[in-house]
């Protein structure tokens, strides 16, 4: 399979331009998008720029902070080299297929190549209506902009594949939701915005020609090694399955709940995308749901791996016309590929869980040991993040159970498990300090707790941004103790719990 032609004829990069756009998706056929101009903002004001990410993308942060930069980040000015488009896609939403969704309040400005030669999208979220808006106003309230900035950057600091946030801007205008709210625009960075739903869009129309164009483009952009395989499209599918199996495991190891895991919110590049009603658990429970629209718990915490597998099955269905020779052979190949998801997920999950438990060697019974701890945590309302952080200290001290015991409603439930855990630790020759160091690197002390995010949003809506900035700074170092910010590691006090989160559309 030759390289995708769109990459060979991408727009030439202007090294003198403040943002060095090098666009490829806008070279695809126009069935893939709508060319559109962002809506303007009445009185744009910069809220935050991600300096480190800007430098990685070869963009001068000082430009982004200038009036000219803010004009670009708000959609008021189209930068040289930018080719704004709204991408088309379809998707299963809570199991029901919608043949046309698309970017209803997001506009892809273009692509840049970072200092390591990796390609990224720059997208404005909250930048106005497109033909995919479906009656919406195309705008974003400030709250969802702040939530995505906080959580996506926290996920990146945790080492979890994710879209990023380059900047947040106040528009100086209000939007009408359940009440009048200040408006904002987020500049999102992603390795691409290719979704399972992008493939479903063309498959649903029987447009095999453009489906092949899309698959070839995705291979070139994300998995170029698949080009040389005997069946490049199956190799591509296998790579996506493996990437999403690893991603699901990473979510489960930190207590992250996506909240709206539709096929249009499943990125084939293996990144977490679309943070609308997402949340991190405080007290552990496998059936935890935060999203206000997930009334039946389809996307509950424990269901996430199975949902990803379901989404991958829908993805396989779109690729059948491209895979192997003949429908039966293609179905057989796809089934063999999706069957590997369970083992790939389980391998990534138990490998990560072993590190959280201080185990370096693979032994029979480790998965059961992990499952038993989680069951006891659920029964005793133990905080997910604090339990694993406290285990780090317990592992370093044979008599150091007190910190973990205090997190359990019935401390004896932990004692029973801890006896077996310490027996398992004794089977490995490893210093206590080496074990503790490894565990600390897998168990953060700081996560974006829901009540902290809500407090930052409420203050921001009132025009005060200190809580937002401080929370972003603390979460940039989630594995460091940062004693001066110890309160950020604490669970919500009674009355502070956030029971529901909202999409923010």
Curated annotation (Swiss-Prot):
InterPro entries (UniProt xref): SelO
Pfam families to which the protein is assigned, alphabetical: SelO
This protein's UniProt keywords: ATP-binding, Magnesium, Manganese, Metal-binding, Nucleotide-binding, Nucleotidyltransferase, Transferase
Reaction equation(s) it catalyzes: L-seryl-[protein] + ATP = 3-O-(5'-adenylyl)-L-seryl-[protein] + diphosphate; L-threonyl-[protein] + ATP = 3-O-(5'-adenylyl)-L-threonyl-[protein] + diphosphate; L-tyrosyl-[protein] + ATP = O-(5'-adenylyl)-L-tyrosyl-[protein] + diphosphate; L-histidyl-[protein] + UTP = N(tele)-(5'-uridylyl)-L-histidyl-[protein] + diphosphate
Positions bound to Mg(2+): 265, 274
TM annotation in the entry: none
Renumbered residue ranges of the record's region Disordered: 485-505
Cofactor needs: Mg(2+); Mn(2+)
Family stated for the protein in its record: Belongs to the SELO family.
UniProt protein name: Protein nucleotidyltransferase YdiU
Species of origin: Nitrobacter hamburgensis (strain DSM 10229 / NCIMB 13809 / X14)
Lineage, uppermost ranks: Bacteria, Pseudomonadati, Pseudomonadota, Alphaproteobacteria, Hyphomicrobiales
